[in-house]
A protein has these predicted regions:
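Membrane-proximal extracellular/periplasmic loop immediately following the first transmembrane helix
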Residues: 36-95, 102, 106-108, 203-213, ...
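Short, strongly hydrophobic transmembrane alpha-helices
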Residues: 7, 11-45, 402-426, 437
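Intracellular coupling helices
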Residues: 5-17, 281-324, 384-394
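Mid-to-C-terminal secondary-structure elements
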Residues: 111-124, 138-262, 458, 462-536
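Membrane-helix entry/capping segments
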Residues: 1-5, 9-20, 50, 227-276, ...
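Small-residue-rich transmembrane alpha-helices
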Residues: 35, 233-234, 321-385, 425
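Alpha-helical transmembrane segments of integral membrane proteins
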Residues: 21-32, 267-287, 320-332, 362-367, ...
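Short juxtamembrane loops and helix-capping segments at transmembrane helix boundaries
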Residues: 44-53, 186-189, 193-195, 250, ...
Length: 536
């Protein structure tokens, strides 16, 4: 074994020019391949940090949203099938103040069953306190920011004010969620705060995410779905009206992320691109290695004259490939570390989340595939050289096997270039597509104005850099399941509902095809899709 290793080192040093090309080619290919397949594995691992995550299901109506009281009704009506259930609502990013320190944190509304349902570890506090509307639960990472060098327990009882207006007391600290989740939050606001505002009733406000933990999903889900119509009769008098859709279904939380067609397409593209790059790298190595066949044939014949068998030659060339691969891996690690910030920005994931012990099999699999493809083919070719080649000049007779390799090389490069052109065209289209409104020179901020809306408008319009001002409840591009609308003849449709001021439409340069802008609380604007679905 040591003799094989010695011969391999000598060969690598003797042909260092060619080997440098091999190492550079393989390093770049492994670098891109590992990142692509690690991103794919990350996308497929969403919510696997939840204990017994296969028991967690999301409630769907038209989308993954439902009525506010739904989870509580599930716990009450199906105690044998439902182990626990929680309801939550995304609040986006909110501003909190710890004294004079400004904190911008992702926030959700949730009930006291959030932690027990998802299996999130509650480090400090009691979940039951989430029934109080004046409390907050925060993540460990946020607690680290505000504990000021003291223990985590010291944050309990501290007050965070929402926009310097509404003080709320910290009553619990929970463990940080993994990055592989669509629902990110560092602050939990009690759902009772919304209930006190008369939000989230039956038959309206379909904007809540209900997550159910079933005891035995295989048999419980079908039984529960069959009994839901009877349950709804207790809470909604018109639930049996056939013209009003109240269809409920449950889908695994583990599939919630990949249910998005955009995510599935991204996974497919990264997988195909990764496979193409690895094949190109492996066969590029094979072609470079085999191009030295005529030159190395005599030395292989000498080895065989000295007693080396075909297996010995095969192992020697596998060792050579392994050494080149090892050096390439070291350089790949150096590249990843050197361009850490760039990689994290492009992938949108921290490297500590992308490369974990649970996903270590991904880069190892990539390396194994490259090693087998790049090592086995040239090793078998070199091992088949007869011992008689030591006595005469080696002339390669069969070259037909090179053509498939060259075809794969050119086909792979053509595919990658074509793929990049398609991506460029899509990017150009996305950046220049007519959105139906004009976002240029528009900035936004979130603030509860209430009766001060006119004062706020006067303040902004008096600023010399402000041309127009408008107000709305949410950003114009936000999309979620919304309200139920009665469109006549006993029919209902569901759609997003947005409160806006009369200055919003002209500011965003939204074109009104028919009618006029809203001027009173009893008027509304609808888009063409709403008209189509309503059948008007």
């Amino acid at each position: 074994m040591m003799r094989h290793f010695y011969y391999t080192i000598q060969t690598l040093l003797h042909e260092r020019g060619v080997n440098i090309i091999k190492i550079i080619s393989m390093t770049l290919g492994i670098f891109v391949g590992i990142l692509l397949f690690s991103c794919v594995a990350f996308q497929l691992s969403y919510y696997n940090f939840c204990p017994q995550s296969e028991q967690l299901y999301v409630t769907y109506m038209d989308g993954p949203f439902t009525y506010g009281p739904f989870s509580a009704a599930m716990r009450e009506n199906f105690p044998k099938e439902v182990e626990d259930a929680t309801i939550l609502r995304d609040m986006g990013t909110n501003v909190f103040y710890n004294g004079n320190v400004r904190l911008t944190e992702s926030t959700i509304y949730a009930d006291e069953h959030l932690f027990s349902t998802l299996g999130l570890k509650l480090l400090i506090g009691k979940a039951e306190e989430l029934t109080r509307p004046d409390v907050l639960f925060i993540s460990r990472s946020l607690a680290e920011k505000i504990r000021e060098g003291n223990s985590l327990e010291s944050v309990i009882g501290k007050t965070l004010s929402v926009d310097r207006e509404e003080p709320m007391s910290i009553r619990g600290v929970f463990e940080d969620m993994g990055e592989n989740a669509d629902i990110h939050f560092d602050v939990v606001v009690p759902m009772s705060k919304l209930w006190n505002l008369a939000r989230g009733g039956w038959g309206y406000d379909i904007s809540y995410m209900s997550i159910i933990r079933f005891r035995d999903p295989a048999k419980d889900i079908k039984a529960v779905e069959a009994r839901i119509p009877d349950m709804l009769k207790k809470y909604m008098a018109d639930s049996s009206n056939k013209k009003k859709s109240h269809r409920f279904s449950f889908r695994p939380l583990l599939e919630y992320h990949t249910a998005d067609p955009t995510v599935r397409l991204m996974i497919l593209m990264m997988s195909v691109l990764g496979i193409a790059i690895l094949l190109i790298v492996a066969f590029d190595y094979v072609l470079i290695a085999v191009s030295s066949l005529a030159r190395r044939a005599k030395s292989i014949g000498v080895h065989k004259c000295c007693g080396a068998t075909d297996n010995s030659i095969f192992r020697m060339f596998l060792t050579e490939t392994a050494l080149v691969l090892f050096i390439s891996v070291l350089l790949t690690m150096l590249l990843i570390f050197q361009f850490r910030e760039f990689v994290e920005e492009i992938a949108g994931i921290r490297l500590s989340s992308l490369f974990t012990w649970q996903t270590l099999w991904v880069p190892l699999t990539v390396l194994l595939v490259v090693f087998i493809l790049a090592g086995a083919i040239p090793a078998s070719i070199f091992a088949s050289i007869p011992v008689t080649q030591v006595f005469r000049r080696y002339a390669e007779r069969k070259t037909s096997w090179k053509r498939p390799l060259l075809f794969i090389q050119f086909a792979g490069m053509t595919f990658i270039l074509g793929f990049l052109m398609v991506v460029f065209c899509q990017y150009h289209m996305a950046m220049n597509k007519d959105l139906g409104y004009n976002p240029e020179r528009v900035v936004m901020g979130w603030k509860k104005l209430g009766s001060n809306r006119q004062n706020a408008k006067s303040f902004f319009m008096n600023l010399p850099m402000v041309e127009e001002h408008g107000v709305g409840q949410q950003a114009i591009w936000r999309s979620w399941s919304g309200e139920v609308f009665n469109v006549g003849e006993g029919r209902t449709i569901k759609g997003r509902f947005e409160w806006i001021g009369d200055d919003f439409v002209p500011m965003m340069k939204i074109q009104i095809l028919h009618g006029k802008n809203v001027t009173s609380p009893k008027e509304a604007l609808v888009n063409e899709e709403f008209v189509r679905r309503a059948g008007w």
